[in-house]
């Protein structure tokens, strides 16, 4: 029965993953404002669901999937996006209700009921946002700019998304509690970077594309940390190079700030690896 529950929870995990990215794409495209902030807050609640589900899967002896479910990112207006977000929530609600009926494990059932309550609230929020977007005349602020600046920002977004998933997966699988905590902390920091870069790209006239590259799926903590150190070293050097190629002072400061964070991550992971190898 555990295998069936794990499969259902991984299906739920895919849905949460899709919702997070869909909502962030919409929020970033709207720029700064009250409704964009509210949508980001909903995305953060979906991140909490993602974490709960992943931990439950590991507790049952499974491996959390990093596959992303189907997203609804089309639509020619902000209100159309909000309708798609309602549909995303309705799909999630139906799936959670189905799994709650199918699962007998009391603790898992209780967890899904807790998440379901949030999803119903989110659906109501997005229904409200349909009207709010129409009344406020909310617009898609993304542009079609494509040059060296947008190329650098697109690369940064791709990297940050990749390591968010990699560090979270490693945090779920490692038995090392200190490493787990640090990996989750750095994943949160990388999520901040993703937001900064996406917002900068929209402000610069571009359009964020949130996709990831290959993710290390090591099962031994030392191997995880070696992979994490390797990618951080490569990326810190690339942020440094990119900052040197940028004339815009504000963007240069942003890239150097992120570079400094990546250097910090290298030091943290290196200390953890040294302890793990003792």
Q: Which sequence ranges carry the predicted segments?
A:
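Iron-associated oxidoreductase/ferritin-like identity signal
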Residues: 1-278
